[in-house]
Each structure stands twice: as C-alpha cells, then as structure tokens.
C-alpha cells in the first residue's frame, strides 16, 4: 500500500476554551480529490492552517508523504510542495493577470528580480502561459487583476498556487461567491488540475462537493463525524442530521445516494 499524501495523528488545536481541531487522525490517499465538509465552526480552515504551517498544533503530528512536517514554517512547507488558497482572495490588483502569475512564480522559486521583465525569462514565460491555460484565463492575460470578475479572481489565485507545480493543493472554498456559470467553469478546471495534482478542498456547495470529490470527510466540532465516498456520505444519517439535512439539500442528497 502506498504512503498517504497527507496523514495526521491526534492533531489538536485549541483557542482558549474552544477546541477547534479535536484529536484528529486522518489519512488521505494520493491521486484523488478529497473534500472536507462540515458546518461553520467545524474546524475545516483551522485544519488547513495546521497543515500549511500558519498555525502550530497544541498536540499531534502532521505528515506529508511520510515526512513529519509538524512545526515547519509556512514557506518551508510551501517549498516541500504544498500550496493553498485562502477564503479571502489575495491578488495584486494593479498588475496584469500574467504578471500576477509571473511575480508569484519568481518569488516562490527564490529568483525574484524586480528589474527583469517576464519576457526575458523564457522558462518563467512558459510557466505563465501553461498556467493561464490551466485556469482558463489566457484571453485575459493582459487585464489588470483588479478589473476581473470575482470568479476570474478566484481562478487567478488558484493559478498563483499551481504555477510552481505543487504536488498537493489545498483549496479553501474556491467557488464561494461565484455565479453558477463561474462555478461550473471552476469545477471543470479543478477536475483538470486533479489529473496531476493531489487536491484537498473545503467547500460548502454540495453540488461542487459531490460533483468533484472522490472521498469526503465530514467534520463536526473539530472531530471526524464520517468519512467515505460521496454516495456513502450522502446515505449517512449522522451527516444528514448534522449537515446535509437542510431542505434545500434534500433533492441533491437523493441524487447522490442513487448515483
């Protein structure tokens, strides 16, 4: 059996009297899209923060492809091949789409030269062009990022994460705020990325979750409530009660059960 791409052992993080992540042990296989879902306050983003090094655990360990990365700094974890996006989108609004990608690529490869243009670096230019295609923004390469639609900004941020070719991508609510058309395009692009990058996604849109994930873990109060395939999760009474039982989700749950 191959080593899991990500594994945690008894991971715990508290904020005062609140236990945000509670003794969480999880093993995520490579070559799949794994969704983390749960009600607000379930510990999903805190889990991402612990994996990416933005927070340190009170106890427990984090392993990436068998390597203990507990306590590593965010830039160290990034260089190991883990990249992430944030709920609050962060781009350079006055720079073009292409320059956002270029400057991120250069900064993360530690070859940032402020007075060197993207055109003078053939490899960087090639990486930018490749990434523009991956995120579907080739036609907007010259547009200032601040003039993009919300959906295109979200895709640009994903591009800024993948331009350095990570092996694990953490997506924190990538479709939040998107129109249905933007969501559909984003899902298609994320599926394409998943062919070569392991992806863990936090998402509240159940259509997105059940349409894109191979495996789903449900968190509640910082602990694992259930884990399994989309059909197994949709058919789990505990999940229905805790998360999927809202009236607006019922039709889709029934579809997932019988898929």
Describe the residue ranges of each PLM region.
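Glycine-rich phosphate-binding loops of nucleotide-dependent enzymes
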Residues: 2-259
């Amino acid at each position: 059996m191959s080593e899991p791409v990500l594994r945690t052992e008894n991971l715990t993080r508290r904020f005062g009297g609140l236990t945000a992540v509670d003794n969480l042990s999880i093993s995520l296989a490579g070559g799949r899209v794994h969704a983390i879902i749960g009600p607000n306050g379930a510990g999903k983003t805190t889990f991402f923060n612990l994996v990416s090094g933005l927070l340190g655990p009170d106890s427990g360990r984090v392993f990436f492809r068998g390597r203990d990365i507990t306590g590593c700094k965010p830039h160290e974890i990034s260089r190991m091949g883990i990249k992430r996006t944030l709920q609050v989108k962060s781009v350079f609004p006055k720079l073009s789409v292409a320059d956002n990608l270029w400057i991120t690529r250069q900064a993360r490869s530690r070859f940032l030269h402020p007075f060197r243009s993207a055109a003078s670096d053939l490899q960087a230019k090639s990486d930018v062009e490749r990434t523009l295609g991956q995120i579907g923004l080739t036609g907007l390469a010259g547009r200032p990022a601040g003039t993009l639609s919300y959906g295109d900004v979200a895709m640009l941020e994903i591009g800024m994460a993948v331009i350095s070719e990570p092996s694990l991508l953490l997506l924190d609510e990538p479709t939040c705020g998107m129109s249905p058309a933007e969501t559909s395009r984003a899902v298609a692009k994320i599926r394409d990325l998943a062919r070569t990058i392991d992806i863990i996604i936090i998402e509240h849109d159940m259509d997105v979750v059940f349409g894109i994930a191979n495996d789903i873990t449900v968190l509640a109060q910082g602990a694992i409530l259930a884990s399994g395939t989309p059909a197994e999760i949709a058919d789990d009474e505990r999940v229905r009660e805790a998360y999927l039982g809202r009236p607006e989700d019922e039709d889709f749950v029934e579809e997932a059960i019988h898929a």
